[in-house]
């Protein structure tokens, strides 16, 4: 358990290891090993390990999930689509958390949040199936009031707000608008009694404002850490991200939001 979990400045870092697997799969080798990366990330201060088992297995594969589960020392957060196959795998593996995400085979990366409003019955059934298996459920959604309310009504105890539009904003004004949507979404989730996480597209120079939001419990970050590790090493990349997040939270608590 992280030291930061016991302090008022608590904000967790979930390190996503998907793109360690992307690098491995680019040449069809056995290295780099995502499990080794996960364990090293934990040693460097990660509070959770996130991995996305996509239907097309483009990066993480079933063997990675099965190998990691008994070895993870923090929490395993398995991202998966709302499909019978993926739900069955999640119930069998029983990660600490399962984050339900939308998925399209044609996308380069996840393009938006899960449409809980439009697929309410299926999502609610998935939440029950996972909860019955002892898995805590998170829903990856856009910072939209209707989606947040619907997520709460499914019985999911956790939401992860999609920060991709904030991260991909073309100018400062657009980024500020998206930031305000996220901040409002955090407040809405907390008001409903939900644990609120966030992630997607966050990196070393845009994470500060999001980490400063006092209601966010956890940020899930992967690609930026893998990329930075090319230059500074894996341990340093993880430690730097965690330090940036905590510093932003401390500054916000001392200076106000």
Swiss-Prot record:
Its EC number is 2.6.99.2. Its main location: cytoplasm. 3-amino-2-oxopropyl phosphate binds at residues 16, 27, 201, 222-223. GO terms for cellular component: cytosol. It is found in: Cytoplasm. 1-deoxy-D-xylulose 5-phosphate binds at residues 18-19, 54, 59, 109. It holds the Pfam family PdxJ. Keywords: Cytoplasm, Pyridoxine biosynthesis, Transferase. It catalyses: 3-amino-2-oxopropyl phosphate + 1-deoxy-D-xylulose 5-phosphate = pyridoxine 5'-phosphate + phosphate + 2 H2O + H(+). It comes from the Bacteria. Catalyzes the complicated ring closure reaction between the two acyclic compounds 1-deoxy-D-xylulose-5-phosphate (DXP) and 3-amino-2-oxopropyl phosphate (1-amino-acetone-3-phosphate or AAP) to form pyridoxine 5'-phosphate (PNP) and inorganic phosphate. Homooctamer; tetramer of dimers. PANTHER family: PYRIDOXINE 5'-PHOSPHATE SYNTHASE (PTHR30456:SF0). This is Pyridoxine 5'-phosphate synthase.
